[in-house]
Amino acid sequence: MRAGHETETSIMRPQYPGDDIRPTSKKELAGWYSYGWAAEVFTVCAMGSFLPITLEQMARDRGVLFSDKVTPCSATLNGPSRMSIQARWTLSSRYDAGRPTVANQCVVYIFGVEINTASFAMYTFSVSVFIQAILIISMSGAADHGSHRKLLLMAFAVIGSVSTMLFLGVVPKIYMVGAVIAIIANTCFGASFVLLNSFLPLLVRHHPSVLRSAREPRPALDDSRAQEGHSDTTNGIEHGIESNVTSPLLHARQGNGENAEADMHPATHITVSQELKVSTRISSFGIGIGYIGAIILQIVCILVVIATNQTTYSLRLVLFLIGLWWFIFSIPAALWLRSRPGPPLATTHHGKHTRSWIGYMAYSWKSLYRTAVRTRHLKDILLFLAAWLLLSDGIATVSGTAVLFAKTQLNMQPAALGLINVIAMVAGVLGAFSWGSFSRVFNLSASQTIIACILLFELVPLYGLLGFIPAIKSLGFLGLQQPWEMFPLGIVYGLVMGGLSSYCRSFFGELIPPGNEAAFYALYAITDKGSSIFGPTIVGIITDRYGEIRPAFVFLAILIFLPLPLMLLVDVERGKRDALALAAELQPSGAQTYGTLPTNEDRAPPSEL
């Protein structure tokens, strides 16, 4: 086995000082999977279920009724943190005779401004996403260059997990501290996952099977075999639940010029196909194991909430468990994941390395600017990114809005809200596998499948708007008037998410100029992360204006519909032609030979994040 590793290593030579060319080991892969198992629970169990309702409930415990602005929302001799949430909802229901209206809505005053308790949670998420986007851009240079990647990953993991555990000590009296902790935890989670995904191309490139394929004889492929390999890869992506991968999967060897990917071994159809197969397999398994862990912990959290009588303390306790899970299962990643240092930054004109944090941050923002300038010449990428910005904002906003709507207007208890999330996750996994079969049966292209997902997604807010129609409202059900209606909508939401996660990223990859995957996927990730600033903020403003969340469904319906005409304008073939033309313009006159280190004079300015 050792001899085999030596042979595989011998076909690669370090490209820069500190370059780790050891083949990817099973233990290293286990470390990478372990962090997905550890951290995925935060986005699914915390952000998707218990964190929004915890923030809302703590604010509610300190708020007053919207109807009279005087009566406390929670009044008890035993203290609000231990009073049963079900009991509090029963008390509030006396104002609305069992029918959800604005009467049981609560407001708090922050710096003299009246804010609905549901809006409080939405504003908190908007702030966290804004900080997260700034942080992701600023740290990308340090993550991709030098030896900081693993250090940053573990630092964000520790800060994020410990912050989540600190919710155990946050009582309603200091609910603003809870908002600050939520912002820190969500920011650290997003940053850590971007860092985790940046390991993926390195694990793939040094995977033993990829190294073996690079060493094997490379016969010329005819068109039919090349097409067959491409088809296999596409099917793998369609069926692989490949979501949230925000780093390049092919030859992202950065730092030795704009097209540093060419510095690797000569690109062939065999090598590219093998790398795509390996990357799809690793990515899919990582996402799958993360969801399995999240489902397990979500069920545990539901049982804990029920066993502790569904109090505010119950919500804080499950957040502590989520943070503890995140912390404990990050330890194998810290032990087994190799640092895999990246290439050093380009030198300055004075010959001094810009390795300070200020230098890394400046490099990151300049790289983003260069990528944005390039995008101006690619009409179809611009159209798709605009559609994706709106669509990803809609995805994130609908999730948070639905949870808060179910709690504040349908009076659903935390255990039931957690169960909805489990159902949505299971439906998402099924959707990721079923959309591929659906598209083949109806002979749909990738863009047409995305459009079908958008149309199905549009049904969610439209169904909520049915509650405004007097004839339906008089029935007492339909139009989200009863708690049970949330469960089928959760299935629809999960199916849509499964389809979009399987298709959007792979569709975007078809439009990227070859050799520039790193920069454009970074732009894709920033569009994804940063878009969620606006939706929750607007929903919060609408809720504050009308005193309830239901009117926000009008905004959500518009937000989900807007990507539809943009996707209809995207021309894949035109996008591919434009991408190839731009790649030809960016192709340097000479590429650095694999295995050699360029001098300062020979090194082209880096352009990728």
From Swiss-Prot:
- What protein family does this chain belong to? Belongs to the ATG22 family.
Kindly state which keywords UniProt assigns to this record, in alphabetical order. Amino-acid transport, Autophagy, Glycoprotein, Membrane, Transmembrane, Transmembrane helix, Transport, Vacuole
Membrane spanning stretches: 35-55, 117-137, 151-171, 176-196, 287-307, 317-337, 381-401, 415-435, 450-470, 477-497, 522-542, 552-572
BP GO terms, sorted? amino acid transmembrane export from vacuole; autophagy
Q: Where is this region: Disordered?
A: 214-240
Membrane topology field? Multi-pass membrane protein
Per the record, the gene is: atg22-1
Major subcellular location class: membrane
The places in or outside the cell where this protein is found are: Vacuole membrane
As for what it does, the entry says:
Vacuolar effluxer which mediate the efflux of amino acids resulting from autophagic degradation. The release of autophagic amino acids allows the maintenance of protein synthesis and viability during nitrogen starvation.
Identification of the protein by name: Autophagy-related protein 22-1
Q: Name one Pfam family in it.
A: ATG22
* InterPro entries, A to Z: Atg22 (IPR044738), Atg22-like (IPR024671), ATG22/LtaA_families (IPR050495), MFS_trans_sf (IPR036259)
Residues that carry a glycan: N244, N309, N443
A GO term from the CC aspect: vacuolar membrane
